């Protein structure tokens, strides 16, 4: 019985020891998620590019693909600050669906959803629920993003709904104009 107690104690000690490193890894990854969310919300592109690998691939929600920090910087400039930019302000909130899937001690895959609010330069505003996935790598003692893919539902989103409402309004207006034109031409033909 004493032997069984010793064996069980060893298993418990080994299990506790094995779980401790993963918890510190997941805490570091949570901190990276918070850092990147805050950087996006504050328009801090310097922090964003400081936390990606030199060969990062970023697929944006609007189907652009950026490779490397310089292209990420150029993308944010094009979308948020350059003449003719589209987005005035972006607010995001990322949620992971599960703990990062770890491969060895230096690679992980994370995925989840985001609730995003866009203020556009044309005065438009909309909220959209996004989906994301990313590959993370540890270089030295730092976790960095090596790949980030961001998407939204193409069949159900606020931009599609806005377009649908515009088309319905245009169809109703065209119908009313057609009826009025027909009535006017009909009256004119009767007088002639």
Language-model-derived ranges and their functions:
Residues 9-18:
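Hydrophobic h-region of N-terminal signal peptides that target proteins for export
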Residues 1-4, 191:
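Positively charged n-region of N-terminal signal peptides that target proteins for export
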Residues 42-60, 67:
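Short, well-ordered alpha-helical segments enriched in acidic and aromatic residues
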Residues 23, 28, 57, 61, ...:
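Surface-exposed, charged secondary-structure patches
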Residues 33-36, 40, 52, 76, ...:
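Hydrophobic alpha-helical core bundles mediating ligand binding, dimerization, or RNAP-core interactions
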Residues 22, 127-160:
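Short beta-strand edge/turn micro-motifs at domain boundaries
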Residues 17-50, 163-170, 178-192:
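Short, low-complexity N-terminal intrinsically disordered segments enriched in polar/charged residues
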